[in-house]
């Protein structure tokens, strides 16, 4: 059975800060950076401090109890790791396009939904991307994450096919890519 050019893994865990610290320990010689995020303001920062990013991502969790009267349960951090095993390298615009597709189809950040979940896409290795999100939306409700792993795999398959990563020629015609902007550095703390 052939391997897919974009390998993806979806999991839910308890701690956003711990996950971000774990992901920061990436490939030696590669400087991790924030590719994009739910907030254009955050994505425009030159340097992102990991504890600050974790606090911002988790803010809807902290506001959930006062809004809804319910305490949030465990495993509220959503993590999607995507690795490119194809011989074709993906640039930031490609990763940006794939990120937008993944957060849209999974229900993490549907296009045009102002109360969607908070998420961030981090480039931690030259051939991969990690998307981190909280599953509580801005309005305090749970995100509708039904079959999210399947949706991510489907988005990766479609992207790989459309860009010729699966051995087939890329689909030609009108192509629109959103600007991802320059690489932005990530640091563990402000000190």
Language-model-detected regions and their locations in the chain:
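N-terminal nicking endonuclease/strand-transfer module with a His-rich metal-binding environment
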Residues: 1-191
């Amino acid at each position: 059975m052939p391997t897919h050019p974009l390998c993806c893994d979806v999991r839910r865990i308890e701690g956003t800060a711990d996950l971000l610290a774990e992901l920061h320990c990436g490939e030696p010689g590669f400087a991790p950076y924030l590719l994009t995020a739910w907030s254009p303001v955050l994505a425009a920062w030159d340097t992102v401090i990991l504890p600050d990013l974790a606090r911002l991502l988790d803010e809807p969790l902290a506001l959930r109890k006062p809004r809804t009267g319910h305490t949030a349960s465990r495993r509220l951090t959503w993590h999607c790791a995507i690795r490119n095993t194809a011989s074709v390298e993906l640039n930031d615009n490609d990763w940006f396009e794939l990120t937008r597709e993944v957060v849209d189809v999974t229900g993490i950040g549907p296009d045009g939904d102002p109360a969607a979940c908070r998420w961030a896409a981090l480039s931690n290795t030259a051939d991969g991307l990690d998307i981190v999100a909280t599953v509580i939306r801005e309005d305090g409700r749970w995100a509708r994450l039904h079959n999210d792993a399947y949706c991510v795999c489907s988005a990766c398959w479609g992207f790989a096919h459309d860009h010729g990563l699966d051995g087939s020629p890329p689909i030609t015609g009108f192509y629109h890519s959103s600007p991802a902007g320059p690489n932005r550095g990530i640091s563990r703390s402000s000190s």
